[in-house]
């Protein structure tokens, strides 16, 4: 499915725009890497196999000490090596765009992948077709893999799939933009260059989403193209990753509040997009609503007070869409078999408490721990 319908008349956000050139779209795949020599042999060959003559594959070696640049060159990628680490994926992308990637213009499409992500069958071809159809920015379907065997990992993967297959599909059907997700992000070259120079936090996917939407461009859900994305190998690694997200959300609100207001001013589509990137974590928000409703219901039953019954009923009605959403999500082919895991949902919500503590601590080097290979071996990314 390529969910990229035209926007309705009068919509503030347009899904499809004209490509600058009539020539076939060229693709440049960009992978920012810090000490990823163990991962790149699994990532680069599937990418190279899908490229056409004229396309490019770049690995940004951000001050690695493990031979990342050597491994990337041996695999056939072009390498831009930064001797002093930029410290984050967003900063590495900005550095590349200002130097080795300065030739990328509106006739190119920029596909950003993580060092451990693997494109699905015909992924690049589907994204190229989207560019030629006039798509300015889009997000491939991020398909979680290597998450079986851990309750928290399985619940996280289920949540990620439901958000894409339900929420993003609904937004696309209404001509609204969807969020970018860090890997599988496709942007036309000129749009990428304009947005990437403003990156300054460690959640570059949220920043790029806001910058592109605030500029009036649509972000299409390109679910015909899939990117396989391994999940963190342990709950501890996943907690560190999510702590970085929470910390980044605070920085985004503090540093880009004008951009947030500009996106909100674009109407329902903009507000929906803001909810997608900033109203997180959803599990905690739903849990808070449920606890508040149960508390009010208990008070009403104890005091027999009608003024308390009314808000309790309203809160339960507010939770009803979440229950319907969950029921629909568990009927998806990709999430079948996970219904029994819902007994651990309260644990998943409570898991965010130590994450909030981690987020409040001093920020260290950016980390995105993942499985190292498509087998049972695990190793964290050390960025």
Explain the meaning of each model-derived region.
Residues 67, 114-129:
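Acidic donor-binding/catalytic loop of UDP-sugar-dependent glycosyltransferases
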Residues 279-363:
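Membrane-embedded multi-pass helical conduit in multi-pass membrane proteins
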Residues 26-28, 56, 207:
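Cell-envelope/extracellular polymer assembly enzymes that use nucleotide-activated donors
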Residues 58, 69-99, 141:
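Conserved donor nucleotide-binding strand/loop of the catalytic core
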Residues 46, 61-69, 84-86, 117-118:
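A conserved acidic beta->alpha catalytic loop
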Residues 88-92, 96, 100, 126-200, ...:
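Long helical/loop segments within the catalytic core of UDP-sugar-dependent glycosyltransferases
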Residues 41-42, 66-73, 122:
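Acidic helix N-cap motif at the loop->helix transition within catalytic regions
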Residues 45-54:
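Short, acidic, metal-binding catalytic loop of nucleotide-sugar glycosyltransferases
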